[in-house]
């Protein structure tokens, strides 16, 4: 292989369509646009969602829902995640360092998903009733 012999793979490059250059080209006369109508004219396109003056679908349907402003700042952590951690004390900083929650997270909650087989102390995190029971059953505790 030499630099002067490099060429694109077969079929990776396509020739530009040259329209309106005679009948023999297959794209002459109307140039693939059909006959008459708005879409055959130059500049003859409408914006996305335009329905010819009829009230468009996106305006006929009601607005729904909202974007939560707190979503980026709260997180959930499972018992399964905590089981994988080496730390005996788990707080928000430990979770961030382990990559279990994002850097922007201000508060996290432990939820009961998976099992916990060792003693763990949870500091400064919320916990569901099921998670709290599982942590205490394993000999751990939750500190505010």
Curated annotation (Swiss-Prot):
One of its GO terms (molecular function) is rRNA binding. Coiled coil: none annotated. Residues 21-31 have a biased composition (Gly residues). GO terms for biological process: translation. Pfam families: Ribosomal_L27A (PF00828). It comes from the Bacteria. Residues 1-48 are annotated as: Disordered. The keyword Magnesium does not apply. The keyword Ribonucleoprotein applies. Keywords: Ribonucleoprotein, Ribosomal protein, RNA-binding, rRNA-binding. One of its GO terms (cellular component) is cytosolic large ribosomal subunit. PANTHER family: 50S RIBOSOMAL PROTEIN L15, LARGE RIBOSOMAL SUBUNIT PROTEIN UL15M. Part of the 50S ribosomal subunit. Belongs to the universal ribosomal protein uL15 family. Binds to the 23S rRNA. NCBIfam families: rplO_bact. This is Large ribosomal subunit protein uL15. It comes from Cupriavidus metallidurans (strain ATCC 43123 / DSM 2839 / NBRC 102507 / CH34). The gene is rplO.
